[in-house]
Amino acid sequence: MQSIAQILASELGQPVQYVENVIALLDEGSTIPFIARYRKEQHGSMDDTTLRKLEDRLQYLRNLDKRRQEVKSAIEGQGKLTEALAAAIDSAATLAEVGDLYRPYKQKRRTRATVAREKGLEPLAQLLLAQEKDCPAPEAAAQAYIDPEKGVETAADALQGANDIIAEIISDDADIRKALRGLLMRQGRLRSLAATEEDSVYRLYYDFEQAIPKLAGHKILAINRGEKEGLLSVTVLLDREAALPALRRAVVKPGSAAMEFIKAACEDAYDRLIYPSLEREARSALTDSANEGAIGQFALNLKPLLLQPPVKGHVTMGLDPGYAHGCKVAVIDGTGKVLDTTVVYPTYGERQKREAIAKLTALCKKHGVAHIAIGNGTASRETEQMTVEMLRSLPGVSYMIVNEAGASVYSAGKLAAEEFPDYDVNLRSAISIARRLQDPLAELVKIDPKAIGVGQYQHDMPQKRLDEALCGVVEDCVNAVGVDLNTASASLLGYVSGLNGTTAKNIVAYREANGAFPDRKRLLKVPKLGPKAYEQCAGFLRVPESKNVLDNTGVHPESYGAAEKLLALCGCGDEDVRRGAVDGLMRKVQAMGEAKVAEEIGVGVPTLRDVVKELMKPGRDLRSDLPAPILRTDVLDMKDLKPGMVLTGTVRNVIDFGVFVDIGVHQDGLVHISQVCSRFIKHPSEVVAVGDIVKVLVLDVDEKKHRISLSMKQVKE
């Protein structure tokens, strides 16, 4: 039997040794970001996505192994565990297969077969099921089991009881269930019909049928939701005449007098027990698969949103639009510190709009505002139009519509109250919106990832699994970018490898009590932050103020000695690194030979390459290499759009059936999957990601329904 490491190696296409190394590192308490970044020699430079797949599958396979042992122990307790059964359980590849094998031995609720066994009909059932050549006719065999005292009045009663027992035995057969399950998933169809006459968003599924292998995940989730709301009736279909022959071949022995009786028992087993059970299993399996796909897509969309390039170092105004409570305003400096707040009422009438423009213009001039961030919620359209009007008298100032999802939840929460105790709840959301433009990652980590709103059906998914996946993405992003130890919030620090909520708060408390950290080593003085946590977190924390230039790089303290040897070998020093005067470092290393240099300084080649990159760009932010966000000074209206126009926009969301693109008209346009590119793709994420800047062609505009149809593939280069 293959070991867990061998199974994972085969699934991931990795050497067994690498997989064993990763398992050992995980078991020692190392995090995925730490393993991905600082243990490349041990796993061949697998990326964080592959490592998380490995971790997820490792957990599943360990749970599977645990369940195997539990099942064997339970069957052994009944004195029924044979070598063959134990071997079958050990080689079961899924929890469903283990469940099938355990099914005959599992304690059941009272069934028709249970009642028949209590009437003493088990021997009759076994006699008929054996289908020996000399087996008497069922009616004759049943005569011996007539017993009015037990409720078996006639031979027909005895045969009915025997049928019930045989049907349950057939239904509990692991091989039969596996074969029919496979047939259902290959040849079955999902059908949904209207359960009501009223119109709804589920009208597409009022008379819908599709082969199971071709079902898209978003359709499964939509149908599930429609069924839950009582608007759809859903069934799984399988051609009975295709299933029964397979069942008969597994059970019926030709030439026996009991053959026709057993055929009838097969049909009863299929109709009454097997099919309803497999239908439930199929629905569950389809839902699980759709959920995993949706969670994966949510995670895929979340990553580029978190890694949006920051617009740092500029005074920024945040506008949280609204009707009843007005438009909340906050001005922050280049570091995110609040300079001013107010509320204006541009939607109350023309006079109030003029007053709002005058007030905001004065604030912009007073503080030297460079950019304005506008939340995309209620009254965003009117606020954007007011801003554009205002910018005509403010040359050099630009604006951007910012996704405000989760801002209201954050502003009313404990975290915002601790951060801004002196500001009203409504003003806190304006501060958050401004900061989202300045540094999206630092601000978005304060919000539950589910609330960021870049997924489908996230409220229908298993929340624990969704949380795990999304928190993993946030963790990967935070550690990929790196965190300034002396300015980061506890929310941001909490996602750093090796840290948790408690140690993150302890770092902030230590910083407030003792002043800025002079270097990374000082972390070891933080309460509850021991050597293991330091090992895991140190490389991801930056200290720009440190005397040691390496403290402001992604070089891990364990590699400081190697980095210093490398600099000496290449005739460079700390000051050269600080001044950015080591551009030719990689060329020098390649000229000397990477393998030779790596051996000389005592690290592997992957670590050497990472050290060189960090020395060449100390304090670098990987987000600066990504396309800058589109800052606008003017606005389009839907009525301005005409088919054939080519516009530049930002991808806001990627889902199964297409891509939503912000083209600056407040209403995102849809690029249907068929219009994403000329080649066939299974999913739009094969081509684009959230945050991508794309050119689109306007295909159609429906002002009444607020729909804009776009194409990417029809844009002429």
For each feature predicted by the language model, list its residue ranges.
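Long, highly charged, low-complexity intrinsically disordered interaction regions
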Residues: 4, 56, 62-80, 90, ...
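Single-stranded RNA-binding regions, centering on S1/OB-family and related RNA-binding modules
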Residues: 543-717
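Short, ordered loop/turn segments at secondary-structure junctions
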Residues: 38-40, 129, 239, 321, ...
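Generic start-of-chain signal for non-secretory N-termini
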Residues: 1-20, 27
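Duplex nucleic acid-engaging cores and interfaces of nucleic-acid transaction enzymes
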Residues: 50-53, 60-318, 322-423, 430
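Short flexible coil/turn linkers enriched for glycine and charged/polar residues
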Residues: 15-16, 28-29, 95-96, 121, ...
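Structured, non-catalytic alpha/beta "coupling" segments that mediate domain-domain communication
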Residues: 74, 88, 99-102, 226-239, ...
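A glycine-rich phosphate-binding loop feature that marks nucleotide/adenosyl-phosphate handling sites
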Residues: 182-189, 319-323, 377-382, 402-409, ...
